[in-house]
């Protein structure tokens, strides 16, 4: 990696990890609203804690009157530069599959493990400590900087929508929630349900969120022959793992962010294949087998793999399944589509296909694609910081499938935290970040803030 110098003494490093641990301990998954706590108790407590930490560092802090967001200001001047990060996390899933407590920092083999340590609490704390180090150096902030703490990034972005109504929009912004060197293009996001009114013979659920590749499901054995079940599971190959218990079988894949399905092993297609093998007949199963199957690029649904040079190939994943004896059957999908595609045209094609199977389409959420001119002074400044830090040259912005806060404001891009050789463990079981990379983040964000302050 690129660690050029010892950025912090032992005491500051100790403080950094203490403060990061103070955020990690909150299971800040979106939950039922309470008065003044629109996304639940844990997110609200985490927001209070990060504001407390920012205040101790020297920021002037503010919490939205309804609890939707908070921010921390430092500096003066007319221009406002924003840094957007989020304190909410995706569900840790079955914690017994973690090697350590997901809500406590675990240091092992040069890595730091915890839910949110990469996405996005670790990078957020790196930003705050970048400001702390600059303040210790005595730098004068002649521009206004605002670190905005989002609370609903992993679900519906209601926090940022509320912010945009009530607060000043930064002139330029970056979010530490993507990749280096700079992300100036993000695929469009479409999350939707395929719904069937068919009666079904069993209750079955898998998946925790639209943007998480599901890595676990369970089947009750009932009168099924265990040997026959084992033969079927073995026919799937070594990508999945399974374990028999007295009355059920537990099947494991590999979790991943839904924007990067190739990094995971999705148990959902295997589950529907198993259900069909049990003799179950249903239109939604036929649809999935005919138009999705084990593909991740939508080519069976749209007739070809859709892609462009700016942002790459479309991805389409089944991320949740909810089957019921007493209500409707629901298949939930996450789709990331190229910046050159039109969402309305894709939706029309999906609906047209679903009609053939007597299935209904329900749109859950969408985000339009992002594309920011790579020649802007702001992007060039961030590229320069990256090149100076890494020693690389002739670096160009990149595109990703993830949906970051870059789409929230005009002139906003993602800047880290992933380097080109980083392991992307976001949304995975045993999420981690290399300790050296975490220290590198403090360095590079410190340099970027200093450059933007010039």
Where are these regions (language model features)?
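Generic non-transmembrane alpha-helical segments
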Residues: 12-15, 19-26, 49-57, 133, ...
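Short beta-strand
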Residues: 61-65, 242-244, 318, 398
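An extended, acidic, His-containing surface patch that forms the Zn2+-binding/catalytic region
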Residues: 259-325, 336-341, 345-348, 360-454
